[in-house]
């Protein structure tokens, strides 16, 4: 099958790779700075919680990176084409780097190295550059919901408990929330790269997708922080119970993202964390039904969280902002659902899978009915160029709509 134009690596792609490394160091530095501030002020409990979140998130990301490195060692085209992760061909050294929590950084450096070769030196290998960038997009999404979202909840909780907040803290909360929503958009654009060019995500589609994620994630995080401000450690029990429900649901959907049973259970456990904050499609078929079930569940859960906060709050401290905050969260959530409905009605492409044959399909299929360009990879056919199979299959699941 002829390969599409996805492999035209440009200077924009290279810049995004550089920005990825820059944000990696900025995020790491910000985490260290916040942890240091907690320690200096004697807030050793919050210092421990923050460091714990950083360590757990880093270990989770490194585990995914290591699993994928092992899976990709069996791909001869990737190994001989210069598309390997830095030190990926040296097993012991690569293992040591992942133990030292440097595997994610090595992937960023590898993406820059390969991108520079393709863009500046005009060497072949665009497909390898995209292979690396697709993995990075997924790893950044995992880091976002395993570290950034919990840290944002912690930040808002501390502000509520101490009843003290500086302007820089409000700016930090707004920036963190925006960053989380944008990372979801970036991941979605990565998935769209596996669809035909006509289905690429335009600016209008990106804006709508960003807005509904921002308007749904923000009240979710705020509701969790408000609940924690009146019940304290019971938020951990709440997280555990919902996480078990979500992991079970992911198992029932028979996910197949990883290439080993252990890796697949790690993925399902991670999906449980992501679902605690935001919707994330993981299985083949129409997404609207599962999305409706998820949002109905999260809406009911959010209502319980906010009612608990309202009944248990300290009226003297919370009265000046309680009603306004409650109405703002409700309005934000309703607007988020509205924008999401608008996106799925007008912008979301559906992967149409022909029952028998692919050749001879018309070239003027509408955006809502497109054919997955790498369907032959999913069916086990060999490819002339390397393809990030796990991300391609995930894109197929995300957009698929089976026909009889």
From Swiss-Prot:
InterPro entries: XK-rel, XK-related_scramblase. It is a multi-pass membrane protein. This is XK-related protein 8. Keywords: Apoptosis, Cell membrane, Membrane, Transmembrane, Transmembrane helix. PANTHER family: XK-RELATED PROTEIN (PTHR16024), XK-RELATED PROTEIN 8 (PTHR16024:SF8). GO terms for cellular component: plasma membrane. The gene is xkr8. It catalyses: a 1,2-diacyl-sn-glycero-3-phospho-L-serine(in) = a 1,2-diacyl-sn-glycero-3-phospho-L-serine(out). The chain crosses the membrane at residues 14-34, 44-64, 167-187, 206-226, 227-247, 263-283, 292-312, 319-339. Belongs to the XK family. Disulfide bonds: none annotated.
């Amino acid at each position: 099958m002829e390969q599409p134009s996805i492999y035209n690596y440009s200077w924009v792609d290279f810049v995004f790779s550089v920005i990825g490394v820059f944000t990696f160091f900025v995020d790491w530095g910000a985490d260290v700075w916040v942890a240091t501030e907690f320690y200096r002020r004697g807030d050793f409990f919050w210092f421990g919680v923050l460091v714990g979140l950083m360590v757990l998130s880093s270990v989770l990301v490194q585990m995914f990176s290591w699993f994928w490195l092992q899976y990709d060692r069996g791909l001869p085209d990737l190994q001989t084409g210069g598309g390997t992760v830095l030190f990926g061909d040296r097993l012991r050294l690569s293992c040591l780097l992942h133990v030292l929590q440097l595997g994610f950084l090595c992937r960023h450096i590898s993406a820059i190295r390969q991108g520079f070769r393709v863009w500046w030196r005009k060497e072949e290998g665009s497909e390898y550059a995209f292979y690396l960038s697709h993995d990075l997009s997924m790893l950044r999404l995992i880091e976002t919901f395993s570290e950034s979202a919990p840290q944002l909840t912690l930040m808002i909780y501390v502000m509520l408990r101490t009843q003290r907040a500086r302007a820089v803290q409000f700016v930090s909360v707004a920036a963190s929330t925006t960053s989380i929503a944008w990372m979801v958009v970036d991941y979605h654009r990565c998935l769209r790269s596996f669809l035909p060019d006509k289905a690429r995500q335009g600016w209008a589609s990106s804006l709508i997708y960003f807005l509904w994620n921002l308007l749904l994630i923000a009240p979710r995080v705020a509701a969790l922080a408000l609940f924690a401000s009146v019940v304290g450690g019971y938020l951990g029990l709440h997280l555990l119970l919902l996480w078990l429900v979500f992991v079970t649901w992911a198992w029932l959907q028979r996910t197949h993202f990883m290439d080993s049973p252990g890796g697949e259970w790690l993925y399902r456990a991670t999906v449980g964390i992501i679902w605690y904050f935001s919707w994330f499609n993981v299985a083949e078929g129409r997404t609207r039904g599962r999305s409706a079930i998820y949002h109905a569940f999260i809406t009911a859960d959010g209502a319980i969280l906010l009612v608990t906060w309202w009944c248990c709050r300290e009226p003297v401290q919370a009265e000046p902002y309680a009603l306004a905050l409650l109405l703002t969260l409700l309005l934000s959530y309703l607007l988020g659902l509205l924008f999401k409905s608008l996106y799925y009605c007008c912008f979301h492409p559906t992967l149409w899978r022909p029952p028998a044959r692919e050749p001879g399909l018309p070239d003027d299929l509408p955006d809502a009915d497109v054919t997955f360009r790498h369907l032959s990879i999913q069916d086990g056919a060999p490819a002339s160029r390397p393809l990030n199979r796990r991300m391609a299959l995930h894109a197929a699941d995300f957009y698929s709509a089976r026909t009889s």
